[in-house]
């Protein structure tokens, strides 16, 4: 895995688009895992996918979480669970009834912070394993959130604001 990431980070020339329209370096391939509206494991994958992250599982698999940037309380966060071989084994929601969930951030304590990109938008802390309901983190403010990053060394949280004259906030 480390070698593949190092190759991906190199400055290799990208090849012509593959069958999925993705340009990749030599030795890499793409696959479409899911499309918006597709039903997987009794869960309909959301429209307007946006910010996401990967979380390791105890059995060497992983969970991919993805925000849904829809308005009118139709936004939220979906999760795809993969086994150690990369086979998709589950799909489920970890947050519903929110608005324009844009980017967010992976926390060191293994949760996903999903940011609403609306006036008076909130930050929701979500459990990627789907065992706990999402919680509003009111202390992170009400504004048009974009993304969040956690600095564990200096014990700081950084938030960006999605405005033309937006700010970078440090907590």
Predicted regions and their residues:
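Sequence/structural signature of beta-propeller domains
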Residues: 1-171
């Amino acid at each position: 895995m480390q070698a593949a990431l190092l190759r991906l980070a190199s400055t290799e020339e990208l090849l012509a688009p593959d069958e999925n329209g993705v340009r990749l370096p030599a030795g890499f391939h793409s696959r479409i895992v899911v499309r918006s509206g597709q039903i997987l494991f009794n869960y309909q994958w959301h429209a307007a996918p946006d910010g996401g992250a990967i979380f390791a599982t105890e059995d060497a698999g992983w969970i991919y979480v993805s925000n849904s940037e829809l308005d009118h309380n139709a936004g939220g966060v979906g999760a795809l669970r993969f086994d150690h071989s990369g086979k998709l084994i589950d799909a489920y929601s970890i947050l519903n009834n929110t608005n324009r969930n844009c980017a967010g951030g992976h926390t060191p304590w293994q949760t996903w912070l999903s940011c609403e990109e609306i006036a008076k938008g909130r930050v929701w802390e979500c459990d990627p394993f789907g065992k706990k309901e999402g919680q509003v983190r009111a202390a992170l403010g009400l504004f048009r959130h974009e993304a969040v990053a956690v600095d564990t060394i200096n014990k700081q949280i950084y938030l960006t604001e999605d405005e033309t004259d937006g700010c970078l906030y440090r907590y």
